Structure formats: C-alpha cells, structure tokens
Amino acid sequence: MAIQIRFERLDEDGKIALHSPFHPALPAAAKARGGTWDKRGECWVFDSRDEEAVRAIARSIFGTDGSDAPRLVTVQHRVTGADASLQALWFGGRQVAHRSVRDAAVRLGAGTVITSGDFPGSGGSSHYPQLRGAGTVLEVRDVPVSLVVVDDDTWIVSADEKPSSPSPLAGVSDEDLAAELTRRGWTVTR
C-alpha cells in the first residue's frame, strides 16, 4: 500500500499545492511553514519558495515526497500502554488501528494484521474511546524504511528488495540502452 503524495504548481502567485492523505501531524507542520488548507482543492497550499521545506515535511510524515519510490518493509509493532490509551494508532505514515466509539470493534488499517493478542470488544469511555489491547502485536506492511525506529516494541520482519515502483527501463537491455544513449549523442562508458 504505497502512500500517494503529489505536488502541483499553481498558476496563481507562485504557489504550490501538496496533495496527500490525512495525517494528524500534517496540519500543524503545514501551518508552521505558512501553509493554508484549500478546501475546494483538498490540498495544502504553500509559497513555491518553500517547496524543499514542504517536501521535507512530507518525507518526515509519509516517508516520501512523491518524487521517489521509497524502500518498503514489513514491521511488527507491539501495542504499548501509551498506544492502548489512544483512539487511533498512526504508524508508518498512516492509521493502522482505530476504535470509533467505546463499544465498537477496533478496525485495522490497510496492510495491517494482528499476529498475536487482540483488542477487547470495548475500550475507554463514551466520550474517550480507547484501543486498549496493550501487548497485541500488529504486522504493518509496506512501511517506508525511513519511518521505522527499531526498538523493543517495533522490529522489521521483512524487507522489499525491489523498489515499490518498477523502473520504466527495467525491460530494456544494457546494450539497447547504451545504443539509444549513443544515438542521442551521449558518451557511454562501462
């Protein structure tokens, strides 16, 4: 499950737009960089001179700024006591578990499965639902490796050895590629 991030240059006054999924850390970071929410366009709008800083924000939250195919890993995360007291758990740039109301079952995000333990049928209060289920181990797939901090409660279980998006030149032989570059005036050396 690759997170879709896109930047767009707007015609008006040298602005850029960041199109991304919701993440609770993004509004404060965007506002701190002078961003404003465009309700109609469903995007954050920034001064184009801040593009590199805004891309850095996207990379820190989502693991990519949309210009690359980040290396993805599968991670297991043990729900901590602090996690269990939350209504929603965000990990790897996305929501991985959420309890909408006290007596609702916990819903897992895309690419997330329980490998051990479980969440109880209810948790928290009517005004403050909680996940509960401390000690439950979640497997979260397709996490950008740059977002993983390995510790006692989080560990990598497998790595994607290939980029998440194949190169458009993957099917072209080295000889054909060298011939085409030479035809275009490039000097090719090995």
Residue ranges: model-predicted function:
Residues M1-R190:
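Accessory DNA-engaging acidic/polar modules
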